[in-house]
From Swiss-Prot:
The lineage of its organism: Bacteria, Pseudomonadati, Pseudomonadota, Betaproteobacteria, Burkholderiales. The keyword Oxidoreductase does not apply. The keyword RNA-binding applies. One of its GO terms (biological process) is translation. InterPro entries: Ribosomal_bL9, Ribosomal_bL9/RNase_H1_N, Ribosomal_bL9_bac/chp, Ribosomal_bL9_C, Ribosomal_bL9_C_sf, Ribosomal_bL9_N, Ribosomal_bL9_N_sf. One of its GO terms (cellular component) is ribosome. GO terms for molecular function: rRNA binding; structural constituent of ribosome. Belongs to the bacterial ribosomal protein bL9 family. Binds to the 23S rRNA. Pfam families: Ribosomal_L9_C, Ribosomal_L9_N. Keywords: Ribonucleoprotein, Ribosomal protein, RNA-binding, rRNA-binding. This is Large ribosomal subunit protein bL9.
Length: 150
């Protein structure tokens, strides 16, 4: 199925590009989430009429993400979990825990934006975690996990 991208999509294309994707990906994800539209003649004309306003909105979203990223860069997120004497946690620190803690400190971050390359944190100490605020804005933060003896 050919679609017009209404937003930048990672590994697919930028705003305004006409790309070919599998039908299920378009129907079940891209179109319902508002990131794309079927590439019909009328849709192309409508898109060209709205192109400037969509590009302006995308630029504003990017600028906002960059300002939040500058504030968030280098931030340390402190979490306390129950741990054994050897420093291993009973359970783990997930992206949901980190997102909740960042939200408490005043940043609007969802768990889907937290990138944990090594999976959940299972030991006490400091770990580096990335936060993807926008497709072009990736910020690295430090997560400090403190052990609480059970």
């Amino acid at each position: 199925m050919q679609i017009i991208l209404l937003d930048k999509v990672v590994n697919l294309g930028n705003l305004g590009e006409v790309v070919r994707v599998k039908d299920g990906y378009a129907r079940n994800f891209l179109i319902p989430s508002g990131r794309a539209r079927r590439a019909t003649a009328s849709a192309k004309q409508e898109f060209e009429a709205k192109r400037a306003e969509l590009e302006k909105a995308a630029a504003a979203k990017l600028a906002e993400s960059q300002t939040v990223g500058e504030k968030l860069a280098g931030t340390t997120c402190k979490l306390t979990q129950k741990a054994g004497v050897d420093g291993r946690l009973f359970g783990s620190v997930t992206n949901a825990d980190i997102a909740e803690e960042l939200t408490k400190t005043g940043f609007k971050v969802t768990k889907a934006q937290i990138r944990m390359p090594n999976g959940p944190i299972k030991v006490v100490g400091d770990s580096k975690v990335s936060v993807a605020l926008h497709t072009d804005v990736l910020v690295e933060i430090t997560v400090s996990v403190y052990g609480e003896t059970a």
